[in-house]
Regions:
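A short beta-loop-alpha structural element at the N-terminal edge
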Residues: 3-19
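Short secondary-structure junctions
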Residues: 5, 139-148
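Conserved GNAT-fold acetyl-CoA-binding loop/helix
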Residues: 24-47
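A short helix-loop-beta-strand connector motif used in the catalytic cores of GNAT acetyltransferases and
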Residues: 45-59
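Conserved beta-strand in the GNAT
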Residues: 59, 65-74, 86, 91
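Conserved acetyl-CoA binding element of GNAT-fold acetyltransferases
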Residues: 81-94, 120
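Conserved acetyl-CoA-binding loop-helix of GNAT-fold acetyltransferases
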Residues: 92, 98-111
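Conserved beta-strand-loop-alpha-helix junction that forms the acyl-donor binding cleft
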Residues: 119-133, 137, 147-151
Length: 161
């Protein structure tokens, strides 16, 4: 399967908003978020991905079809060094999971953006924990550190590539 990343332009903003709703629907099982009175979860930082330096919104395609998205952000939960990056959000649609698409996509992301990385996920999201551990172990050849947030809600990994 051909996996490609496409940097989203501002013209893709409404596509990202729609995909973010799918993501937030699934994520609500962990965050316990509710929809608003208009039937949306919303996402406070959508516009920031086109207005703030260091943010990169990527569309993930599998054989040309939309399969998900990845948002790179400079505001890490744990890592505070200048130039550090984190995966702000990462989503692969259900029909594309467990096929190696997420691993291929995130490997491309790491290769495009060299430097200091932080990957955090909610502790109660066990499938995310399994995915990110596998990705980070494979990508770094087991050269990573573990991290966590002060509120003990998130855990994750840091590394440099």
């Amino acid at each position: 399967m051909d996996i490609t990343l496409h940097l989203m332009s501002v013209d893709d903003k409404y596509l990202l908003i729609r995909l973010m709703e799918l993501y937030n629907y699934e994520f609500s099982a962990y965050s316990n978020d509710d929809i608003n009175e208009y039937g949306y979860y919303g996402y406070d930082h959508i516009d920031d991905y086109w207005n703030e330096e260091g943010r990169f919104p990527y569309l993930i395609r599998a054989d040309g079809k939309i399969a998900g998205f990845a948002l790179i952000c400079p505001h890490c939960d744990y890592r505070k060094e200048k130039g550090a990056r984190c995966i702000g959000e990462f989503f692969v649609m259900l029909k594309y999971r467990r096929k190696g698409i997420g691993l291929k996509a995130v490997t491309q992301l790491f290769d495009k953006h060299r430097g200091l990385w932080e990957i955090c996920y909610w502790k109660n999201n066990l499938s995310a924990g399994q995915f990110w551990k596998k990705v980070v172990e494979k990508y770094t050849n087991n050269h990573y550190q573990t991290c966590g947030t002060e509120d003990n809600i998130k855990t994750g990994f840091t590394f440099e590539n």
